[in-house]
């Protein structure tokens, strides 16, 4: 017997009148039926016409088009989200490719910078250091009781924009919007959180409208103890939640992940999500070329936690294809602002020290100084893949790309830094410098490039291809942890969905219009791997399929029936 989806059953609610209209998760606006208007004391509070959600979407989209500035469009969409969440997600679903860059990167970066200026209405939790004694009470104050996914930031490394203080809240809000729009996770189950530990950004500290704690960032033991107080409070309030760390500074991101990954179900999207989507793209590119990843040589510009996280995932895949750990690491070249990471560089972080090149292997290289530049790496190591996670614009110069193309007929070039203003090279330039031969994937959205009358689609190596599917898979399987194997399976599942890998042509990654189907597929593979790893509580395949469909939320209005508190 086919089970009735939850969305088809009536929802019993105690709210009525203006209070109901002020509740974004429940508000239908003009779509309340005549019966509901009578039952919930709404007559006179709404215009006479009873509309369908399709009619509401049409009006909202017309209003959206009236805004010419992307930031204004972002503010408008956020206002709908804070008024009527079902309408917001139906509108987003109807225009996903067009609106994703507005609700998330690159537009969300500007929204974070101006968060205190454009603030309209509270969403999520602002947990400040001065109120640290009340964290349990703050979590109890959340308007959502059955939270299944939390995205938390401390606002210190927002995209490529640095310290934005509580302005970083725009990132958890945007990320969770994509969990719902792309992964079908009900907005009733999501909670954005910002840990307000101060800010070192003088613009924020000196801004009379800044809404956060006006204090330099706390560090060291104070910081670690505060984060731990938050984590322990979350475990008490929602012990089975999936917690995603987002946009923490390099000095904190990896230590926090390592500290808590075996304590609760958590992952860091900047490290693990970026690595997973990048690896999926590289597996797809290798398949399209009839090769394996173990045959490639990879150079990185940017050796922070994100870059090193990607490198470790690539190494794991190379090892699964037959290389030893030593052989795989010999194919990875990490360059940061001090040059190539080698055993001669002092003060390397632990995760960087695992990715150094030994000096004796570089003895024959032609270099000008001990600080080996990216250009010198390209000339000597002859990489077939170039990945940028530096957060600095224009560092993939014409000389570097042309030098790479000399020894690699079809180089893969991935300038992943975002927002768009921080990209290492623009796709149009890369295509031109390689005579149309480069395979390009970027971190921010770019329009297709036309070169010599041929159109080149530019894949956006966007984490939204990965994390919504991981989230849905974790929730459906009841996974207690996010393991490395689950992330690896997510990468391979994404590669399975690549039009280029399957057909030899077309874009490297699926169209954003297909992202819901991609997320469902990734969720299924992740959930199955959770079973294999022994971290799932749903153990049968049939129950797993049912759980994925049951947990996949659609933006449709439910029939309301009244109940009392």
From Swiss-Prot:
Homotetramer. The record marks 270 as: Important for activity. This is NAD-dependent malic enzyme. One of its GO terms (biological process) is malate metabolic process. It catalyses: (S)-malate + NAD(+) = pyruvate + CO2 + NADH; oxaloacetate + H(+) = pyruvate + CO2. It comes from Proteus mirabilis (strain HI4320). It comes from the Bacteria. The gene is maeA. SMART domains: malic, Malic_M. Keywords: Metal-binding, NAD, Oxidoreductase. One of its GO terms (cellular component) is cytosol. The active site is at residues 104, 175. HAMAP family: NAD_malic_enz. Its cofactor is Mg(2+); Mn(2+). It is an enzyme of class 1 (oxidoreductase). Divalent metal cations. Prefers magnesium or manganese. Belongs to the malic enzymes family. Its EC number is 1.1.1.38. A divalent metal cation binds at residues 246-247, 270. One of its GO terms (molecular function) is metal ion binding. InterPro entries: Aminoacid_DH-like_N_sf, Malic_enzyme_CS, Malic_N_dom, Malic_N_dom_sf, Malic_NAD-bd, Malic_OxRdtase, NAD(P)-bd_dom_sf, NAD_malic_enz_proteobac. NAD(+) binds at residues 157, 270, 418.
């Amino acid at each position: 017997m086919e089970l009735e989806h939850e969305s088809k059953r009536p929802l019993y609610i105690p709210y009525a009148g203006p209070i109901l209209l002020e509740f974004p998760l429940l508000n239908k606006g003009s779509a309340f039926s005549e019966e509901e208007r009578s039952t919930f004391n709404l007559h006179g509070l709404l215009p006479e016409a009873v509309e369908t959600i399709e009619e509401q979407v049409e009006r909202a989209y017309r209003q959206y088009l009236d805004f010419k500035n992307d930031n204004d469009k972002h503010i408008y969409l956020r206002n709908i989200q804070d008024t009527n969440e079902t309408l917001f997600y139906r509108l987003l679903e109807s225009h996903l490719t067009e609106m994703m860059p507005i609700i998330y990167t690159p537009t969300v970066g500007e929204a974070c910078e101006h968060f205190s200026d454009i603030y309209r209405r509270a969403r999520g939790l602002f947990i400040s250091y001065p109120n640290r004694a009340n964290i349990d009470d703050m979590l109890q104050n959340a308007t959502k009781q059955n939270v299944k996914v939390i995205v938390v930031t401390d606002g210190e490394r927002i995209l490529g924009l640095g310290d934005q203080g509580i302005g970083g809240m725009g990132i958890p809000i945007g990320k969770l919007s994509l969990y719902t729009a792309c992964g079908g996770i009900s907005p009733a189950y999501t909670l954005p959180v910002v840990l307000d530990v101060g800010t070192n950004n003088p613009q924020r500290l000196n801004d009379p409208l800044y809404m956060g704690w006006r204090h330099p960032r706390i560090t060291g033991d104070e910081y670690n103890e505060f984060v731990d107080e938050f984590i322990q409070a979350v475990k008490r309030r929602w012990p089975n939640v999936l917690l995603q760390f987002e946009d923490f500074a390099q000095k904190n991101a990896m230590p926090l992940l390592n500290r808590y990954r075996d304590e609760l179900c958590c992952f860091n999207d900047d490290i693990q999500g970026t690595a997973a989507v990048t690896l999926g793209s590289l597996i797809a590119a290798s398949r399209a070329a009839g090769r394996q990843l173990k045959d490639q040589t990879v150079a990185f510009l940017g050796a922070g936690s994100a870059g090193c996280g990607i490198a470790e995932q690539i190494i794991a895949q190379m090892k699964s294809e037959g290389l030893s750990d030593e052989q795989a690491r010999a194919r990875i070249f990490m360059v940061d602002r001090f040059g190539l990471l080698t055993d001669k560089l002092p003060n390397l972080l632990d995760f960087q020290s695992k990715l150094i090149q030994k000096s004796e292997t570089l003895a024959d290289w032609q270099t000008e100084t001990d600080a080996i530049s990216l250009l010198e790496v390209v000339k000597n190591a002859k990489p077939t893949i170039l990945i940028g996670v530096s957060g600095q614009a224009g560092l993939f110069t014409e000389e570097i790309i042309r030098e790479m193309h000399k020894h690699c007929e079809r180089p893969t070039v991935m300038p992943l830094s975002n927002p768009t203003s921080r990209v290492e090279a623009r796709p149009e330039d890369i295509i031109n410098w390689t005579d149309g031969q480069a395979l390009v994937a970027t971190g921010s959205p770019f329009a297709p490039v036309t070169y010599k009358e041929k159109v080149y689609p530019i894949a956006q190596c966007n984490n939204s291809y990965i994390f919504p599917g991981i989230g849905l898979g974790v929730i459906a399987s009841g996974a207690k942890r996010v393991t490395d194997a689950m992330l690896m399976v997510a990468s391979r599942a994404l590669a399975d969905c690549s039009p280029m890998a399957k057909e030899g042509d077309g874009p490297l990654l699926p169209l954003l219009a297909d992202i819901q189907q991609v997320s469902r597929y990734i969720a299924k593979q992740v959930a199955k791997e959770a079973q294999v790893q022994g971290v799932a509580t749903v153990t049968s395949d049939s129950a797993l399929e049912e759980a994925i469909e049951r947990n996949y939320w659609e933006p449709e209005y439910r029939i309301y029936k009244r109940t009392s508190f």
